[in-house]
Amino acid sequence: LVNGAGVTTSPATTLTFSAGDNLVQGEVVYVSGTYVLPASAASGVDPALWNPIGITAEAAVAAADVDVILDDIAIVSSGNIVHQTALTPGQYYYLANIPGKLTASTAPSGITTSGLYGAMTPVGLALSASELHVEIGSPVTLT
């Protein structure tokens, strides 16, 4: 960003938070107070869970510091993805109805109200089988 005086600033792409629970690397998280917790797009949960801020850069135990990738490349594993063993390059991924997980819109269950989803929240674009460019979008409430 460049202001009127020609001074350039770059927003942070990673921030450090306190883990509100035990977290694994590549987990999709939202902020609650001063803690980050696993986000979920499930129906019947507090809509705050539908608003992820990023993906954890490393594993952390509850109350420990954890870096969260807000807008950069995150490494995710098969344990972070629903119905897939790896990311599909070029595929967009969304917040799953399972806390902290990602799903492709083409997953077998899809993202529908019949799949117990309350919202569809874009999280990022797969660059490789394990790299996701984090691009958090606004949740779309499903009715």
For each of these PLM feature ranges, what is it?
Residues 3-143:
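Glycine-anchored, exposed beta-strand/edge motif detector
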